[in-house]
A protein has these predicted regions:
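Short hydrophobic beta-strand immediately N-terminal to the Walker A/P-loop
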Residues: 34-36, 48
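Conserved ABC transporter NBD signature motif
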Residues: 60-73
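Conserved beta-strand
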Residues: 6-9, 17-34, 65, 129
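Helix-to-loop junction immediately C-terminal to a conserved catalytic motif
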Residues: 52
Length: 131
């Protein structure tokens, strides 16, 4: 079973005519490491936002298709539920919603700190993700 499944995903930002995502179909298995690469404006950040519900939840553009995380449709669940399964580290740490952090480690640890995870466990979990 795929951990993340994308089915015919399309998205267009409000007040634009160009699709940011145009019919994407793929699966990511649990435990996989995946890099998303492409030119500026190719839809990399938009795709990541679709993984954790910012699209269509926060950005209200034209949305079609499905993103499923462990067979749960992202568009039909809450962002708080999705945050338990999917994290997002933005491209520029100084533009984070969480405030300016100095390192990638601090960015990854931010969510765990908010959940009250003990420091030793947090360090271990962040180290594991960074490997």
């Amino acid at each position: 079973m795929a951990y993340i499944k994308v089915e015919n995903l399309k998205y267009r930002y409000p007040n634009t005519t160009k699709l940011a995502l145009d019919g994407l179909d793929f699966e990511i298995e649990k435990g996989s490491f995946v890099g998303i690469i492409g030119e500026n404006g190719a839809g990399k950040s938009t795709l990541c936002q679709a993984f954790n519900g910012l699209i269509p939840g926060f950005f209200k553009g034209a949305y079609g298709g499905k993103v499923l995380i462990e067979d749960t449709e992202v568009a039909k669940t809450t962002v708080s539920k999705l945050c338990q399964k999917v994290g997002l580290v933005f491209q520029n740490p100084f533009n984070q919603l969480s405030g300016a952090k100095e390192t990638v480690f601090e960015e990854i640890a931010f969510g765990l700190q908010n959940f009250g995870v003990p420091k030793e466990e947090m360090i271990s979990r962040v180290d594991e993700v960074m490997e």
